Amino acid sequence: MSIASITSTAQGSATVLDGKALAKQIEQQLRTRVDAIKAKTGRTPSLATILVGDDPASATYVRMKGNACKRVGMDSIRVEMPSVTTTAELMAKIYELNSSPDVHGILLQHPVPAHIDERACFEKIDLAKDVDGVTCLGFGRMAMQQSAYGSCTPQGIMHLLEQHNIELAGLEAVVVGRSAILGKPMAMMLLNANCTVTICHSRTQDLESHIKRADIIVGAVGVPELIKADWIKAGAVVIDAGFHPTDNGGVGDIELQGVENIASAYTPVPGGVGPMTINTLIRQTVDAAEKAAGLDNS
């Protein structure tokens, strides 16, 4: 999809970027790869998830990731630590998982209790097992277009765009949000795809004017429906990475009502970006297991 085709898309014909359906297709491929790893090594690819404390939302996310592992035949190693865990104790657990040949990927569930130095703990994850793309070294390698596992949500978004044959080169991209795990890596991935990228955030003046010129918009700011539908220009690609529960299910960071009559393509909420985030985590863990088994062809 070129700039010309984006700007000329007829109203009402927007493509729904269905992350749930794509993730299901990819899982079938991953199961075949997992079986091949088992056949060669006798080991089952495994993802270790570390949950510190008893936050219900975090526990739900960890359970969802464990279920995704099971669907492709992987092992899920759930490490639960009490909320009084110290930074040193958490680092010791990460070192233990780093050294285990039975662990191929490590995920430290965000957020950890406030007294723990989360960033310092992220940095202790072995780069070869950083399948959630949280280390500074991994980010730097990704930014320089070297081999690394990308942060899962932006990497999942890029895969979703690729699978729908959306050509990004030359597009004006606006990323709303600058978090270390979403906004910043998203902007860098789009830059590496030859977009002209603007990053907007809480101090941005006149957000509307930036949105109105965007060929591709990524809502990654964590504010319900901050970006209004009438700001979106005709034919834009709309990616909503937010989710905020409501009585009717949930909304994202972008007002999606009527967007099918404006955009050329958009992600639904829910069912767009979320499934691709977890799918990317599993896919990158399988990648790591293949590398450990000498099956990587890249």
Curated annotation (Swiss-Prot):
The keyword Cell division does not apply. Its EC number is 1.5.1.5, 3.5.4.9. Keywords: Amino-acid biosynthesis, Histidine biosynthesis, Hydrolase, Methionine biosynthesis, Multifunctional enzyme, NADP, One-carbon metabolism, Oxidoreductase, Purine biosynthesis. The keyword NADP applies. Pathway: One-carbon metabolism; tetrahydrofolate interconversion. Gene3D superfamilies: Leucine Dehydrogenase, chain A, domain 1, NAD(P)-binding Rossmann-like Domain. PROSITE patterns: THF_DHG_CYH_2. One of its GO terms (molecular function) is methenyltetrahydrofolate cyclohydrolase activity. It holds the Pfam family THF_DHG_CYH. NADP(+) binds at G177, R178, S179, S202. It catalyses: (6R)-5,10-methylene-5,6,7,8-tetrahydrofolate + NADP(+) = (6R)-5,10-methenyltetrahydrofolate + NADPH; (6R)-5,10-methenyltetrahydrofolate + H2O = (6R)-10-formyltetrahydrofolate + H(+). It comes from the Bacteria. GO terms for biological process: L-histidine biosynthetic process; methionine biosynthetic process; purine nucleotide biosynthetic process; tetrahydrofolate interconversion. GO terms for cellular component: cytosol. Belongs to the tetrahydrofolate dehydrogenase/cyclohydrolase family. HAMAP family: THF_DHG_CYH. Homodimer. This is Bifunctional protein FolD. It comes from Psychrobacter cryohalolentis (strain ATCC BAA-1226 / DSM 17306 / VKM B-2378 / K5).
